[in-house]
Structure formats: C-alpha cells, structure tokens
C-alpha cells in the first residue's frame, strides 16, 4: 500500500526551490506525532489551486526546514458556491458542523446569533472562538484535500445576514414544516445562501422575516434532525443536485 503523504497549510506565497522553516506547532506535529525524518515528503497547500510537493531538509529540536520541489494544479472546488449561515450551537456541535460543512464543500461560513441562541451576550469571547473555528477549517482542509480555505466570517445577528441579497444567489432554509422539496427547486443553481438553525429553532418573528427576505423553505425529509445532522444532510442534498456529488 502506498504511504500517505502528510499535508500541511502554509499561508504565504510559495515557489519552486524555496526553503521554508516551519512553525513550532508544525515542527512538534511532524517530529513527535508523525515521527518523520530527513528526506521524508510533505504536501503543502496555501489557499490556491496548487499543491506543492516538498522534502524535509533539516530536522532538529526546535525547527524543521523543508524545500519546495514541484507544484501541481489541483482544483477540488465544487461548481456550487455555498455560503452557510449557521446559528451558533454548543461547542462540540458547532465544531462538528464547521468541520463537516468544510469537508462537503462549503465556501463561506457565517456564525449567527438568533433569539433562541444562548450566546448573544458573549460577543467578547468570539475573537478567540473565531480563531478556533478557523483552525478547524484548516485541519478539515488538510484531511479532505481541499486546497482553498473556506472563510469564517465574523459572527453577526441572523436577520441582517438574511436580509442581504447578492446577484444569482438562491436563499434556502431547511424546515421540517416546509411543503417544498429540493426537487422542486430550479434545475440549475450556482450559488446558495443556506440557513441552518440551532437546537431551539427560530422564533415566530425570525421565521416571518426569513421568508420575507426571500428564503425558500425546503423540507429535508419526514424526520426532525439535530442541527449538526441537518447541516450535513442539507449540504449533501445540495451538492448531489447542483454540485459535485452527482
């Protein structure tokens, strides 16, 4: 069996024959966790449509140096652009939702506050939360071989986010009480603004405004899904019909 080449993200411009000193966190990971040695290979990505093949030049207690050997175009992005508005849920559920939505091809994620969300008064905590979520996105890209990093937007309140409309964007909210199914959507959709609620759902006012702002309520099926299950089911259904899972 062919040995898997580890992937890491480096956030700056890369070129052939460039020598790079890796960060302390990657040095620890490569040396202590992966137990890699001199001349072992690494795959690098840097938020472009390229992957870069590299080799370890030097490895010691404090740093690892690698050299970029070659690059290759590799675009794994779906033709369907998805901007996910995810109402903020409890830590592990939110982490899981972000991780799986990245693996399934979401391009942008905006964490949202809603009336039934328990985090409205904790805005002070969210700069650290955002960094944590961005690290989850990068780890997910390392795992699923995406080379373009989805963007985590700053958290905001649900209704201003829902009110915004961009050209050629279809607004969708999945709701167990909806009557439309995904098969009743137009045959071709290129860009989706997808809204997923938290465990408590939406208030009556929020539902009224969400519909007023142009969101199409779609039914996923006969069962009530947890928020972290709903995000997987919704994105998968959209990618099968309009994206790259068909």
Swiss-Prot record:
Signal peptide: none annotated. It catalyses: uridine(1498) in 16S rRNA + S-adenosyl-L-methionine = N(3)-methyluridine(1498) in 16S rRNA + S-adenosyl-L-homocysteine + H(+). It is found in: Cytoplasm. GO terms for biological process: rRNA base methylation. Its EC number is 2.1.1.193. GO terms for cellular component: cytoplasm. Disulfide bonds: none annotated. Transmembrane segments: none annotated. Keywords: Cytoplasm, Methyltransferase, rRNA processing, S-adenosyl-L-methionine, Transferase. It comes from the Bacteria. NCBIfam families: PRK11713.1-5, RsmE family RNA methyltransferase. Belongs to the RNA methyltransferase RsmE family. Homodimer. Specifically methylates the N3 position of the uracil ring of uridine 1498 (m3U1498) in 16S rRNA. Acts on the fully assembled 30S ribosomal subunit. This is Ribosomal RNA small subunit methyltransferase E. It comes from Buchnera aphidicola subsp. Schizaphis graminum (strain Sg).
């Amino acid at each position: 069996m062919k040995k898997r080449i580890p992937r890491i993200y480096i956030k700056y411009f890369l070129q052939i024959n460039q020598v790079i000193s890796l960060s302390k966190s990657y040095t620890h990971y490569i040396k202590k966790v992966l137990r890699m040695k001199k001349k072992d290979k690494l795959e690098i990505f840097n938020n472009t449509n390229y992957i870069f093949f590299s080799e370890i030049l030097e490895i010691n207690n404090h740093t690892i140096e690698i050299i970029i050997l070659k690059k290759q175009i590799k675009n794994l992005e779906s033709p369907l652009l998805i901007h996910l508005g995810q109402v903020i849920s409890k830590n592990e559920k939110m982490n899981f939702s972000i991780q799986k939505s990245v693996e399934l091809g979401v391009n942008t994620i905006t964490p949202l506050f809603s009336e039934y969300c328990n985090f409205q008064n904790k805005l002070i905590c969210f700069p650290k939360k955002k960094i944590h979520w961005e690290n989850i996105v990068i780890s997910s890209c390392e795992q699923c071989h995406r080379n373009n990093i989805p963007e985590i937007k700053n958290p905001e309140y649900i209704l201003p986010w829902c009110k915004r409309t961009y050209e050629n964007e279809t607004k969708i909210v999945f709701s167990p009480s909806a009557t439309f199914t995904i098969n009743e959507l137009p045959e071709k959709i290129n860009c989706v603004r997808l809204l997923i609620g938290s465990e408590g759902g939406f208030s009556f006012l929020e539902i009224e405004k969400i519909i007023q702002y142009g969101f199409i309520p779609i039914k996923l099926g006969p069962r009530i899904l947890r928020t972290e299950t709903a995000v997987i089911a919704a994105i998968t259904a959209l990618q099968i019909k309009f994206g790259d899972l068909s």
